[in-house]
Regions:
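Membrane-interfacial helix-loop connectors
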Residues: 72-94, 102-122, 197-234, 243-249, ...
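Helix-loop-helix hairpins and the membrane-proximal interhelical loops
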Residues: 1-49, 148-195, 213-216
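Cytosolic, long alpha-helical scaffolding segments
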Residues: 82, 108, 219, 245-251, ...
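Hydrophobic alpha-helical transmembrane segments of multi-pass integral membrane proteins
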Residues: 46-72, 186-209
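Membrane-embedded alpha-helical segments of transport systems
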Residues: 62-69, 88-104, 120-126, 155, ...
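Short helix-coil transition sites and intra-membrane helix breaks within transmembrane domains
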Residues: 16, 27-31, 60-68, 164-167, ...
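Hydrophobic core segments of alpha-helical transmembrane domains in multi-pass membrane transport
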Residues: 11-24, 56-60, 126-137, 150-162, ...
Length: 565
């Protein structure tokens, strides 16, 4: 047994592991640093396709994987946060963003003459500095910076290990023969690229390994071109797998990614094959790591430029491939489950959890949606009482069912998000959101209780006096404004809105006490029937409790603002 060969194989395997782990740590740190900016970037998608491309490129540059970005897009489309037209731009941009890693890796080709400039020279120092920041720094931002630095250091150490383990064998005939076969057979090269990328689940990682081989001068241009084209197609595998069990549109998003990359590979692969036929010297030229970076970037930018005007065509093609359900299938699906529960299950798509910062933003967005449902229920219940409206009573019951489902799904989702790798600040937000959904659900319960009183009022033909109706209108309007401001404070993280809630809640308490005393006077003077009076006082009490829950929401926001200071 050749001990040296075994040792080099171990070194190569360790190098791959270190490279992949370093890239993962670096991406995780960058993603945490990006935080809620992810949500703002997604908001830009509604403007135009060019901005969507830029956003896709930026997000992928952060998370270092076009496949991961597309998985996130599949999750957004599945949850109804993004249309297919918006998604196609992000998918195109993702292919550009993933080339950043290739440029970082290409720095490793700096020669021994300038060893002091080689990233691997500084890699151990980077790991050391990063580890100190992660282990001993108390500030979250410094810890994130430490993760990024450690990741970069490990990435370059891994590349150096791989390069060093291969260097003794660069003159071996097996390398030249292997790349000669791959270069002369485009389909084989593309297949190798697809398989390696599918296994590693990252085109950035597979391109990095190819560049390591190129640094040692064993990769021919034709082989590199075809393998790179395959790597682009291989990056689609992650999204395709993740689209299983999603909506038709989510499957179409994954399909568009595949169509886009296959189209690019066909166009460039055909062109490259023809070029190499007329320029055989170029085909067998040993490509450098930097040249792979140039080709990788050039290929993706040109493909995006060519295909961008045909984004709508990609959407149509994906619709032809992934057809709508037939009417019978749709009916069977609806009969199988609660349609609103099915819709909510798509809202809380587990694919979004792969991007923790986005998952946190999604949690907040869903809490706001739940809050607005409870706000609607306050309005419905007030209308039911004021107008003896049976339709409004039915609406309250329907909305309360939705709020209960939201509480169930949101609680499960928040538990999952809280277990992700998120910042301390995000953990505090998630804990407050747990409290928020309890208050929001209780408000909807109170609305249902008030609708029960409205039903009792209708069935027993109870009529409030004109004074009583005016008093209820005045109090209910304040409660609606109070809860609306509480939702605004939670959504916008607004101190002004939170202070408004506290002020209005005090006014509600004072007004409720005043109206209660006035009504007791009317009961004492015989202007109101005792049976009517009990219902009226119960409604006052319910409205006051609703404002208490609004105040709880505002107090959480004010506490978060104080904590930040």
């Amino acid at each position: 047994m050749n001990i040296e060969l075994v040792g080099n194989l171990f070194m190569f395997a360790g190098g791959i592991g270190m490279f992949l782990y370093g890239m993962n740590i670096m991406a995780d740190g960058m993603q945490k640093s990006a935080g809620s900016k992810m949500k703002q970037l997604i908001g830009y998608l509604t403007r135009n396709r060019l901005l969507a491309v830029l956003v896709g490129a930026f997000i992928t540059a952060i998370i270092q994987s076009s496949g991961a970005t597309t998985v996130m897009v599949v999750g957004f489309v599945n949850a109804g946060l993004m249309t297919l037209v918006q998604a196609v731009g992000v998918i195109m941009g993702a292919n550009i963003g993933t080339t950043i890693t290739a440029w970082i890796v290409s720095l490793g080709q700096l020669g021994d003459a300038v060893k002091v400039l080689k990233p691997s020279f500084y890699a151990p120092l980077l790991v050391g500095i990063g580890a100190i920041l992660v282990l001993f720094s108390k500030k979250p931002k410094k810890k994130m910076a430490g993760e990024i630095v450690v990741g970069i250091g490990l990435l370059f150490l891994g590349l150096d290990f791989m390069s060093e383990s291969i260097s003794p064998y660069t003159d071996a005939p097996i390398f030249s023969k292997a790349f000669e076969v791959v270069g002369s057979n485009p389909l084989l090269g593309i297949a190798i690229g697809i398989v390696v990328t599918a296994i590693l689940q990252s085109s950035s990682a597979s391109v990095g390994i190819l560049q390591t081989l190129a640094i040692n001068g064993v990769v021919t241009t034709n082989a590199a071109v075809f393998i790179t084209l395959g790597q682009n197609i291989g990056s689609c595998v992650t999204a395709i797998i993740s689209s299983a069990g999603t909506t038709r549109n989510a499957k179409r998003a994954a399909c568009m990614h595949l169509l886009f990359n296959v189209a690019g590979a066909v166009i460039f692969g055909t062109g490259a094959f023809i070029l190499f036929m007329f320029k055989p010297a170029l085909a067998v030229h040993n490509i450098t790591s930097v040249e792979i970076s140039i080709f990788h970037t050039f290929f993706n930018i040109i493909c995006t430029t060519i295909m961008m005007p045909f984004g709508s065509l990609l959407v149509k093609l994906s619709g032809i491939i992934i057809r709508e359900k037939t009417e019978d299938e749709e009916n069977a699906s609806l009969e199988a489950s609660d349609s609103y529960a099915a819709e909510l299950s798509r809202h809380f798509d587990s694919r979004i959890l792969e991007q923790p910062s986005v998952a946190v933003d999604r949690a907040l967005s869903e809490v706001i949606i739940m809050g607005n449902l409870s706000l609607d229920n306050i309005k419905y219940s007030v209308s039911a009482v004021m107008n003896n409206d049976q339709d409004m009573i039915d609406k309250v019951i329907e909305t309360e069912h939705k709020v209960d489902l939201y509480e169930k799904y949101l609680t499960e989702y928040l538990i999952k998000v809280n277990n992700l790798s998120i910042t301390e600040e995000q953990h505090l937000l998630i804990n407050d959101l747990f409290h928020a959904i309890i208050d929001i659900e209780r408000v909807s319960d109170h609305a249902e209780n008030m609708s029960d009183l409205a039903k009792y009022k209708i069935d027993n033909e109870i009529i409030f006096s004109q004074h009583g109706m005016e008093e209820l209108k005045k109090l209910s309007e304040k409660v609606i404004v109070c809860f609306s401001e509480a939702i605004k404070a939670r959504e916008k993280f607004s101190r002004v809105a939170a202070d408004n809630v506290c002020r209005i809640e005090d006014e509600v308490d004072d007004l409720e006490e005043e109206l209660r005393n006035k009504h007791i006077e009317r009961l004492s003077s015989g202007l109101c029937k005792p049976s009517n009076g009990v219902v009226f006082l119960d409604i006052l009490s319910i409205l006051e409790r609703m404002s208490d829950h609004a105040n709880n929401l505002a107090d959480c926001v004010l506490a978060e603002i104080k904590e930040k200071k």
